[in-house]
A protein has these predicted regions:
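N-terminal signal-anchor transmembrane alpha helix
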Residues: 2-27
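Nucleotide and nucleotide-moiety/phosphate-recognizing core
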Residues: 4, 8-9, 53-59, 63-101, ...
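Transmembrane alpha-helical segments that form the membrane-embedded catalytic/substrate-channel core
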Residues: 13-22, 90-101, 177-186
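Membrane-embedded alpha-helical segments of multi-pass transporters/permeases
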Residues: 21, 69-70, 102, 138, ...
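Cytosolic, membrane-interface loops and tails of multi-pass inner-membrane proteins
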Residues: 22-54, 188-206
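Short, non-helical or kinked segments that cap or interrupt transmembrane helices
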Residues: 31-42, 102-115, 142-150
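Interfacial segments of multi-pass membrane proteins
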Residues: 44-51, 72-75, 92, 96, ...
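Loop-to-transmembrane alpha-helix initiation sites
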Residues: 127, 143-150, 164-175
Length: 206
């Protein structure tokens, strides 16, 4: 079983290194991280390339996340730990997304990954976290604030639904905490009133 765990964790982490924003910006012979906030995430991509190509970013990041959860789950299923495997795979793909060794450890903040981890593990958690994100975003136009509160809700969802499964619950807490940690600079700007509002559903560039 330990070999399956090691292989699953490594595969999930490496899948996390496949960053959608970096991949699509590379098609333009560019690097999204050289623009705006310097972050390899969906928001920075939309700000600099518009939302028409954002779908490809979403597909890549969603695909790698779901695949990581599935692979890790299948590896541990013979040992009776399918749910735990999916959750561990989700945690490691998020770590790989945030700290990608193949991209100089300059990755994204993990919000999109967190959403699809929630979908892969328990759709109820994903729906609640997404509802919080959208509610806060439409009320304030602050993607970062919606992301932080959505990530916090993700963790709370795992606590609520999996309090009887310590490993799954702890993985969920760590995932939410990691996403919040990745937004630490945004949190400081929010507190200082310097955070930039974003119109995700309005084209900036075509």
């Amino acid at each position: 079983m330990w070999l399956a765990i090691v292989v699953g964790l490594l595969v999930s982490y490496l899948l996390g290194n496949l960053n959608g924003a970096v991949c699509i910006s590379a098609l333009h012979h560019d690097d999204v991280r050289s623009h705006g906030s310097g972050n390899a995430g969906l928001t920075n991509f939309i700000r600099n390339y518009g939302r028409r190509q954002a779908l490809y970013v979403i597909l890549i990041d969603a695909g790698k996340t779901v695949l990581a959860c599935l692979v890790m789950g299948l590896l541990l299923e013979p040992y009776g730990y399918y749910l735990e495997g999916r959750t561990l795979g989700g945690l490691m793909v998020m770590v790989g997304h945030a700290f990608p060794a193949l991209l100089g450890f300059r990755g994204g903040k993990g919000i999109l990954s967190g959403l699809f981890i929630g979908i892969s593990v328990d759709w109820r958690i994903a729906v609640i976290a997404l509802a919080v994100f959208l509610g806060i975003y439409f009320a304030t136009r602050y993607v970062s604030l919606g992301s932080v509160l959505g990530a916090t809700t993700l963790s709370l969802g795992f606590v609520l639904f999996y309090y009887d499964n310590l490993l799954v619950m702890l993985c969920g807490i760590v995932m939410g905490a990691l996403a919040v940690f990745m937004h630490r600079a945004n949190i400081i700007r929010l507190l200082q009133g310097k955070e930039r509002k974003t119109h995700l559903f309005r084209n900036i560039k075509e």
